[in-house]
Curated annotation (Swiss-Prot):
Disulfide bonds: none annotated. This is Photosystem I reaction center subunit VIII. It is found in: Plastid, Chloroplast thylakoid membrane. The gene is psaI. The keyword Transferase does not apply. Keywords: Chloroplast, Membrane, Photosynthesis, Photosystem I, Plastid, Thylakoid, Transmembrane, Transmembrane helix. Belongs to the PsaI family. Pfam families: PSI_8.
Amino acid sequence: MTASYLPSILVPLVGLVFPAITLASLFIYIEQDEIV
């Protein structure tokens, strides 16, 4: 019921969110490093 369609939502969500967080944190780190 809920568990049957939950993976089909979580898999692309995790696959998109984690790279986005990684790129965002890396971008912020590089920007702060260049400013200082």
